């Protein structure tokens, strides 16, 4: 199937909410080796975000059930085995994306904007792996996530306006990484607050086409700050990551 057909099929799959099909189409487009257009890049990102998001959500539910069934050995074993099955799926998806990023997407990125987008994506998918990692593996995975976010963050500060939705989305997710994965609420708050304040100070640089995206992410940054600085330290913190682009 040629590239245009694959892209059309991915759009059709998106409308049908068949994200596994959508991801498979965009994976094939990526493997053809050409740099992706903005539209193709967004289709790839949306597809995998939904595919991995379904597993992350299932994993949380089953993990919670597993913890609640302590003492009921049979039930707990069933929940544990099911959680492990979901984890395997989740890892396979993340490794698929990380392989596309390493082989094609990051090396082919010719603009700072694409480079930041893909490095942020690398940080995100290592973060999803870190959520389910345990033991010796975990530290290496967390380091990979942090390095990708940090590299993206440095490029974005040099090359992009503080109001750019990709720069803001990166700050949002990097701050969630500090809060959730590194358990560093101070660092998470400082990063989110700086990103929010810098964007507010330059609101006049907001371009018309990204106005909606940028203001939505600014709202999420502010919501997270409110949540993180209040005493309620619950896992709702993750909610702040839901509206990134």
Curated annotation (Swiss-Prot):
GO cellular component: blood microparticle; cytoplasm; cytosol; extracellular exosome; extracellular space; focal adhesion; glutamatergic synapse; hippocampal mossy fiber to CA3 synapse
GO terms (BP aspect): angiogenesis; cellular response to glucose starvation; ERK1 and ERK2 cascade; establishment of Golgi localization; Golgi reassembly; lung development; negative regulation of apoptotic process; negative regulation of innate immune response
Disulfide bonds: none
Impact noted for substituting residue 184 to A: On DNA damage, loss of MAPK8-mediated phosphorylation. Loss of binding ABL1. Attenuates ABL1-mediated apoptosis. No loss of interaction with BAX under stress conditions. Inhibits translocation of BAX to mitochondria
Major site of localization recorded for this protein: cytoplasm
Variant or mutagenesis effect after changing residue 53 to R: Found in a patient with a neurodevelopmental disorder; uncertain significance
Effect after changing residue 58 to E: Loss of homodimerization. Reduced dimerization with YWHAE. Significantly reduced interaction with P53. No enhancement of P53 transcriptional activity
N6-acetyllysine: residues carrying this PTM: 3, 68
SMART domains noted in UniProt: 14_3_3
Site-annotated residues for Interaction with phosphoserine on interacting protein: 56, 127
SUPFAM superfamilies: 14-3-3 protein (SSF48445)
Modification type Phosphoserine: residues: 58, 184, 207, 210
Positions in coiled-coil regions: none
The protein's assembly and partners: Interacts with CDK16 and BSPRY. Interacts with WEE1 (C-terminal). Interacts with SAMSN1. Interacts with MLF1 (phosphorylated form); the interaction retains it in the cytoplasm. Interacts with Thr-phosphorylated ITGB2. Interacts with BCL2L11. Homodimer. Heterodimerizes with YWHAE. Homo- and heterodimerization is inhibited by phosphorylation on Ser-58. Interacts with FOXO4, NOXA1, SSH1 and ARHGEF2. Interacts with Pseudomonas aeruginosa exoS (unphosphorylated form). Interacts with BAX; the interaction occurs in the cytoplasm.
Family statement: Belongs to the 14-3-3 family.
Name this polypeptide is given: 14-3-3 protein zeta/delta
Name of the gene encoding the protein in the UniProt record: YWHAZ
